[in-house]
């Protein structure tokens, strides 16, 4: 077939990509951790996290999941906004060989129940702000392990405690909830899971590009939300495609580690998720925006340091 569109590509945009550059998405993560080490990966509320910290935290959480008896291929739901725990959890899920099920934190109980049942998720990592929604439906799902994150978990010992206190007691953003406890369901705090995982051995899991990385659910605008099966190859290809089209702009940056991307789009959406992985591949960093609907704080965040990429959608 004559690819007539290629003549319209800019001169420095490649015509082809090769997803086989990586053996899996986990391979991409591993190389990022090895190559970028002490470079910053993200900043949230002025708390920076390096690639090395992301490596250590995600390995600890992955080890904790493995110690709970989860097997490769099991589905783990991730119900978090754009906070540092998101990348840690996502990397832990992938590195341990599980399938990541991204969940919109603003889902209603009905929507959440459908997605958890349809995906067959056996574990969930959720911000406590939204645990009241989970409490309404958890007994109708296959969830056996709930990891409860608090807003300040990864924001430092002093500032983090203050943020969690403010969110709970001043802003009153954590509605009351009660989750069942027993043999069939365990509740663990995010910080406790990390602490326990640091004492356990992490077992690397062989993976290929054809393994399932994500069950990424559609918006549900025309009916029930449907889980799109995304393999490691799908995500790697998306990352390389995005990088190819950003190449003309990125070539003007002498040091990609200084490239600052604004992560205001929800990371549980595939577009923002792809750009998160692109940052990892390049060694650049993300400015995490937990609540972009708060425009005053959003603008304040944008003013704090120069940014180079602001992904958005026209809706």
Model-derived segments and spans:
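Conserved AMP-binding A3 loop
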Residues: 50-52, 213-240
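Conserved pre-ATP/AMP-binding loop-to-beta segment of ANL
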Residues: 172-174, 179-217, 224, 249-260
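Conserved AMP-binding/adenylation subdomain of ANL enzymes
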Residues: 236-260, 268-311
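Adenylate-forming
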Residues: 81, 126-136, 149-157, 265, ...
């Amino acid at each position: 077939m004559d690819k007539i569109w290629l003549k319209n590509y800019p001169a420095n945009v490649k015509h082809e990509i090769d997803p086989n550059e990586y053996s899996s998405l986990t391979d991409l993560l591993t190389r990022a951790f090895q190559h970028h080490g002490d470079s910053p990966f993200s900043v949230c509320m002025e708390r920076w996290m390096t690639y090395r910290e992301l490596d250590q935290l995600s390995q600890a959480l992955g080890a904790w999941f493995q110690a709970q008896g989860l097997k490769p291929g099991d589905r783990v739901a991730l119900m978090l906004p754009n906070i540092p725990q998101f990348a840690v959890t996502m990397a832990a899920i992938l590195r341990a060989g599980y399938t990541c099920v991204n969940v919109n934190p603003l889902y209603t109980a009905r929507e959440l129940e459908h997605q958890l049942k349809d995906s067959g998720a056996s574990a969930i990592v959720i911000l406590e702000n939204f645990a009241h929604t989970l409490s309404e439906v958890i007994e109708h799902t296959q969830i056996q392990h709930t990891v409860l994150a608090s807003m300040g978990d990864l924001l430092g010992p002093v500032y983090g405690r203050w943020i969690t206190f403010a969110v709970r007691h001043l802003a009153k953003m954590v509605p009351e909830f009660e989750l069942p406890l027993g043999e069939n369901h365990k509740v663990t705090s995010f910080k406790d899971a990390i602490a326990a995982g640091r004492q356990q051995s992490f077992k690397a899991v062989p993976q290929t590009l054809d393994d399932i990385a994500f069950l990424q659910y559609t918006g549900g605008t025309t009916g029930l939300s449907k889980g799109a099966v995304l393999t490691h190859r799908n995500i790697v290809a998306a990352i390389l495609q995005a990088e190819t089209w950003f190449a003309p702009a990125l070539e003007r940056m002498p040091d990609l580690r200084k490239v600052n991307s604004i992560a205001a789009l929800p990371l549980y959406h595939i577009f923002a998720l792809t750009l998160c992985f692109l940052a990892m591949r390049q060694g650049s960093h993300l400015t995490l925006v937990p609540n972009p609907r708060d425009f005053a704080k959003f603008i304040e965040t944008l003013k704090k340091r120069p940014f180079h990429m602001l992904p958005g959608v026209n809706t």
